[in-house]
């Protein structure tokens, strides 16, 4: 989320992508001007005020260049790019396949820089791209692109990451309709300042959770899926008869939360309703 340790460049401010595009054009212009003699610190000066979080922190960014080539100190000139959105996998094999993907991406972009225009996702960033079905589709696109570029990858190599990050809650079949529940991603936002005995604190609202509901074999005109009696706004995945929705719910009631007057929604009850019967 926007207040995490590794927010995306387009996650907190809507104008950041516009500024990033200008910065990248400037880097291209300077490369054409200086060639191999381009000063390394120019990259730092060009991007350091863009690769930041909402408060301007240069370290808390998905791509942190604090230690790449900052002229401010010797510790800032280490040639390091931190990819802070990665977490340590629970198994060495999962770590190896992540490293293999990164090395292949670097090799590919070194030969052919990636020049596709940046997408303006808007609210889809926290709607579509928090759900495992669409993230898996996106990962399959990446694997297909890498294979087309001559780097042999298999989507099955990343199945453990998918199952680890989005564990299955359960599945049920009824009337030819299959309903699958998986844990999805949900940002825990940092809230406003509050006083405490030790000074000022800012809590994170950890009360929210998200579940993905995926339905296959459903007839739109006949079946409705509900959660606690409320119909779900299912969206097509592009596959006939397959639909997906994300359910955000309040799992518990902490003393400090974003909406303190809304009670906990758990437990959740999902129903497949046949409107013809």
Task: For the regions a language model picked out, list residue spans one by one.
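C-terminal accessory/tail domains of diverse enzymes
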Residues: 1-277
């Amino acid at each position: 989320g926007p207040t995490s340790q590794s927010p995306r460049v387009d996650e907190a401010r809507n104008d950041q992508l516009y500024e990033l595009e200008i910065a990248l054009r400037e880097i291209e212009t300077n490369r054409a001007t200086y060639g191999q003699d381009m000063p390394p610190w120019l990259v730092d000066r060009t991007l350091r005020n863009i690769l930041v979080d909402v408060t301007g922190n240069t370290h808390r960014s998905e791509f942190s260049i604090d230690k790449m080539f900052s002229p401010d100190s010797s510790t800032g000139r280490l040639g390091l790019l931190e990819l802070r959105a990665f977490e340590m996998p629970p198994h060495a094999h999962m770590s190896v396949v992540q490293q293999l993907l990164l090395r292949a991406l670097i090799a590919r972009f070194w030969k052919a820089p990636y020049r596709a225009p940046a997408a303006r996702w808007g609210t889809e960033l926290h709607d579509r791209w928090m759900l495992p079905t669409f993230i898996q589709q996106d990962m399959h696109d990446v694997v297909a692109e890498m294979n087309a570029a001559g780097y042999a990858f298999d989507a099955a190599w990343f199945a453990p990451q998918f199952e680890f990050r989005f564990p299955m809650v359960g599945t049920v079949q009824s009337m030819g309709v299959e309903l699958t529940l998986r844990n999805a991603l949900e940002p825990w936002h940092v809230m406003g300042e509050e006083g405490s005995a030790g000074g000022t604190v800012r809590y994170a609202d950890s009360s929210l959770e998200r579940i993905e509901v995926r339905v296959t074999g459903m007839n739109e005109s006949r079946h409705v899926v509900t959660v606690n009696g409320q119909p779900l706004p299912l969206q097509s995945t592009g596959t006939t008869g397959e639909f997906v929705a994300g359910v955000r719910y309040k799992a518990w009631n902490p003393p400090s939360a974003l909406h303190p007057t809304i009670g906990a929604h758990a437990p959740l009850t999902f129903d497949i309703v046949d409107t013809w019967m």
